Amino acid sequence: MDVHEILLVEDNPDARETLRLLLELEGHRVVPAETGESAIALALANSFTLALIDIGLPDVDGYQVARRIRSSGASMKTRLVALTGYNQPEDVRQALAAGFDAHVVKPVDPDALTRMLSDLLRE
């Protein structure tokens, strides 16, 4: 199994810790962030394979985080996954338009997340 470095952006401490543990159990290295601005700084300064980004962040929303990461050019290879409590077709369209590669609804199903990440990281 390949080890990937994953940026995890979630402002809720319990959700962040749960997702961090899940990803680490899968063998990945996880770098946590709790704000959009810190996520952008980390993404631009590092080379992550994947970033899980909560849409509802307290400072800069996840859509803006994705747009800024994508517009930098440096992180074009990073797979971006939106974490959100909304699953309407418009929510998915908005995530894709912002530059996300995938859309995951919270609360996250661990098995479904593991399968989806495996598929994304294989591409």
Residue positions per predicted region:
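The feature encodes the CheY-like receiver
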Residues: 58, 88
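Acidic, metal-coordinating helix/loop segments flanking the phosphotransfer/catalytic sites
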Residues: 32-50, 93
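Two-component/phosphorelay signaling modules centered on CheY-like receiver
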Residues: 13-31
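Acidic catalytic/metal-coordinating carboxylates
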Residues: 35-38, 61-65
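Conserved acidic carboxylate
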Residues: 10
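C-terminal output helix
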Residues: 90, 108-117
